[in-house]
A protein has these predicted regions:
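Non-catalytic C-terminal accessory region of glycerolipid acyltransferases
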Residues: 2-17, 21, 176-177, 181-355
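Alpha-helical bilayer-embedded segments of polytopic membrane proteins, i.e.
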Residues: 25-68
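Extended, polar/charged low-complexity intrinsically disordered and coiled-coil segments in eukaryotic
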Residues: 55-72, 77-78, 276-278, 325-328, ...
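Catalytic core of membrane glycerolipid acyltransferases/transacylases, capturing the structured
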Residues: 62-78, 89, 106-187, 201-220, ...
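N-terminal topogenic membrane-targeting module
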Residues: 77-99
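A residue-level signal for beta-strand positions that form part of recognition/binding surfaces
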Residues: 93, 109, 140, 194, ...
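Cytochrome P450 fold signature focused on the C-terminal beta-domain
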Residues: 93-94, 166-172, 326-333
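A short acidic-Thr-Gly-centered motif at the start of a beta-strand
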Residues: 100-104
Length: 355
C-alpha cells in the first residue's frame, strides 16, 4: 500500500527565525564555541550535579531560585532573551532536506515520527532553535516527549506551550482537537496541530552509537503511534536524522537489558560521553534531518494494524536507503529491534566506534 520514496533535493536555506534574527548574519565561528558548549550542557542536564550540590549545601536558597526561574520563564521578555541566545549559539552544521515530492499541507493534520532518538534528538532541537516550530512547510507542530522533559530549562523557552507528554491519551487529544494547545492553535491560526513524536523512545536512545555500520530502530514491537494515526485518520510524516547516532559514545554493558528496562520504567538508561570524556560536548554536529512523503496510515483500518506496522518499517527503511549516501552514511544499514527482538548476535560482537 506504500509507494517507494521519491525524494527531491530541496534544502532549507538560512532564514529569519521566529525571533526576527536573521541567521545568515551569524557565522558558525569558533568564537561561539563556548556558547555552543554551554547550550549542549544545558539541554543535556549538565547543570544537575551543581543543582544537587546546591540543594545539599543551601536547600532553601536553591528552592527559592528554582521557584523564581519557573515563575519568570513564561514571561515574553525572558523567553525572547533565552531564544535569542539559543539562536546565536546553535551550530550551523545541522541541515534540513525536504525529500517529499510536494510540500505538506499545513491545513491538514499529520503525525510526525522522528527517527532515531539519539541523545534527546539534537537534530530537531537545533533546527527548532534556529527556525522555530513551523519550519516544516508551515505545519503547526507540538512536541510530545517524556513527561519531565517539558520542565527542563531551555525546553520551555524553545517550545513555549507547544510541548507535552507522549502518552496515547495526550496524542489522541491533540489529534481530536480537544487538547488546550490544539484549541489555541485552531482559534489563533485556524490550523490543526500536528503531534511530533520519537517512536523509539528511551529504549532506542540506549542503542545510540551501538555499532559503526548499523543504525538500530527500536520499534519491532511498537505499534501504538501507528494505531493513533489510524484511529484519527491522519498520515505519518516520516523523518530521519542522519549523523545523530555519531554525536556521542554510549555504554555498551547490558545494552539490550537496559533498553527493555527503559521501556518498562519510562526512564532513560543510557549513559553517554563526548570526546575526551567531556560528557555533553559532542563528537560531531554534522547532522542532516530529512523529511519524506507521508506514510498513508489513514488508508488502513485497525484490523490491519500489524500490516500497517510492517509496511511502515519497510517504508522507513526505503526512505533511509534512498538518502543515506547523500548524507554521508552510505556504509550504514538500518536494523529493526525490539523487546523480543535483540540485535543480530554477530553484529553486536563487531568493533564499536569510540567505545
Amino acid at each position: 500500500m506504500v509507494d517507494d520514496a521519491a525524494p527531491t533535493d530541496n534544502r532549507l536555506e538560512a532564514a529569519p527565525t521566529d525571533n526576527g534574527l536573521d541567521e545568515r548574519s551569524i557565522p558558525d565561528s569558533i568564537l561561539l564555541a563556548p556558547l555552543r558548549a554551554a547550550i549542549h550542557h544545558g539541554r543535556l542536564l549538565g547543570y544537575a550535579p551543581w543543582l544537587i550540590y546546591a540543594m545539599l549545601m543551601k536547600p532553601r536558597q536553591t528552592v527559592a531560585g528554582i521557584g523564581t526561574y519557573y515563575s519568570i520563564r513564561r514571561s515574553a521578555l525572558w523567553r525572547s532573551c533565552v531564544r535569542w541566545l539559543l539562536v546565536k549559539g546553535s551550530s550551523r552544521q545541522p541541515r534540513y532536506i525536504r525529500a517529499q515530492t510536494k510540500p505538506y499541507d499545513p491545513k491538514r493534520q499529520y503525525l510526525l515520527a522522528a527517527h532515531p532518538h539519539g541523545i534527546l534528538n539534537y537534530g530537531w532541537w537545533n533546527l527548532f532553535c534556529r527556525f522555530g516550530l513551523n519550519f516544516v512547510d508551515g505545519v503547526q507542530m507540538i512536541m510530545c516527549v517524556a513527561p519531565l522533559v517539558k520542565f527542563y530549562p531551555l525546553y520551555g523557552e524553545i517550545f513555549n506551550d507547544r510541548v507535552t507528554d507522549a502518552s496515547k491519551r495526550t496524542i489522541d487529544s491533540i489529534l481530536k482537537g480537544y487538547h488546550p494547545a490544539a484549541k489555541t492553535c485552531a482559534a489563533e491560526k485556524q490550523l490543526p496541530l500536528t503531534p511530533a513524536i520519537i517512536p523509539g523512545g528511551f529504549s532506542e536512545a540506549t542503542y545510540t552509537a551501538a555499532h559503526p555500520t548499523i543504525e538500530y530502530a527500536y520499534m519491532a514491537d511498537r505499534m501504538g503511534f501507528i494505531k493513533c494515526a489510524i484511529e484519527a485518520g491522519v498520515d505519518i510524516i516520516v523523518a530521519y536524522s542522519f549523523g545523530l547516532n555519531d554525536m556521542y559514545s554510549t555504554l555498551a554493558w547490558q545494552r539490550h537489558v537496559r533498553a527493555v528496562k527503559a521501556q518498562a520504567w519510562g526512564l532513560p538508561t543510557v549513559l553517554w560521553t563526548g570526546p575526551y570524556l567531556l560528557g555533553n560536548t559532542p563528537f560531531t554536529e554534522q547532522i542532516t534531518v530529512v523529511t519524506f512523503d507521508p506514510f498513508p496510515a489513514s488508508k488502513y483500518t485497525l484490523d490491519q494494524l500489524p500490516q500497517a506496522h510492517s509496511d511502515y518499517m519497510a517504508y522507513l527503511k526505503a526512505c533511509f536507503d534512498s538518502k543515506k549516501s547523500e548524507c554521508g552514511h552510505g556504509h550504514k544499514e538500518l536494523e529493526f529491534i525490539g523487546k523480543s527482538k535483540p540485535p543480530n548476535a554477530m553484529a553486536t560482537q563487531a568493533p564499536r566506534s569510540r567505545l
